Design a protein with these regions (language model features):
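Extended, low-complexity cationic-aromatic segments
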Residues: 1-87
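Short, basic/hydrophobic alpha-helical segments
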Residues: 81-101
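Short, conserved catalytic or adaptor-binding loops enriched in Gly and charged residues
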Residues: 122-128
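Active-site proximal helix-loop segment of RNase H-like, two-metal nucleases, encompassing DDE(D)
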Residues: 138, 146-165, 178-182
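Mobile genetic element proteins and their domesticated derivatives, centered on retroelements
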Residues: 20-22, 61, 67, 86, ...
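Acidic/histidine-rich, metal-coordinating catalytic segments
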Residues: 97-111
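Short catalytic/ligand-binding loop motif for oxyanion handling, primarily in non-cytosolic enzymes
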Residues: 27-29, 109-112, 142-145
Length: 182
């Protein structure tokens, strides 16, 4: 626990960002009947019946001190999906970082073996040379800021019926601003 708290106390360093990572499953639900649109004084009305359309997974990475959030929607939550998400962070979001310090829970997909099972040994070593994992202790997921961000996203944009992965993937769903804390 103190390892995580010590990281949070460090000053912001763009060359050594602290990035919280987590994921959330999302059940895809469609409307059995068309909803009644909202009008002045009345909210949108939905029928209680729905159609199950499968599930999806939302990966979330949050760099609180820089005010950044990255999301990726996948059909499943596998070791490969996690490794590809982290590779994208390393290559596209933090290409100039010396090391990305990732705070994650102890889920089995959040381990180093995910990279070796997904990529060639050289590629896995390249990615892992740029990241440093810090794991939250058991029963301490509240230490991971990505958990809090997922809750905010749930309340503000995904805590409603979403019937397909394309709608869920739409970046406009994830427009809640992150305020930099330094």
């Amino acid at each position: 626990m103190y390892d995580i708290l010590d990281l949070y106390e460090e000053p912001y360093d763009p060359k050594r960002p602290i990035v919280n990572v987590d994921e959330k499953p999302k059940q895809l639900l469609g409307d059995k009947r068309k909803s009644i649109p909202m009008r002045p004084g009345c909210s949108e009305k939905y029928d209680y019946e729905y159609i199950r359309k499968g599930t999806a997974n939302i990966f979330v990475a949050v760099e609180i001190k820089a005010g950044k959030r990255f999301t990726q929607v996948t059909k499943r939550r596998t070791m490969k999906d996690f490794a590809v998400f982290i590779q994208k962070l390393v290559d596209e979001e933090y290409p100039d970082a010396e090391v990305i310090r990732i705070i994650a829970d102890n889920l089995n997909t959040h381990k180093i073996k995910s990279f070796y099972k997904t990529f060639s040994e050289d590629e896995a070593n390249r990615i892992l040379s740029k990241i440093e994992f810090h794991y939250t202790p058991k029963h301490s997921s509240w230490l991971n800021a990505a958990e809090i961000e997922i809750n905010i996203m749930d309340v503000e944009c995904i805590g409603r019926r979403i019937g397909d992965i394309e709608t869920l993937s739409d970046r406009n769903l994830f427009t809640h601003p992150i305020y930099a804390v330094r």
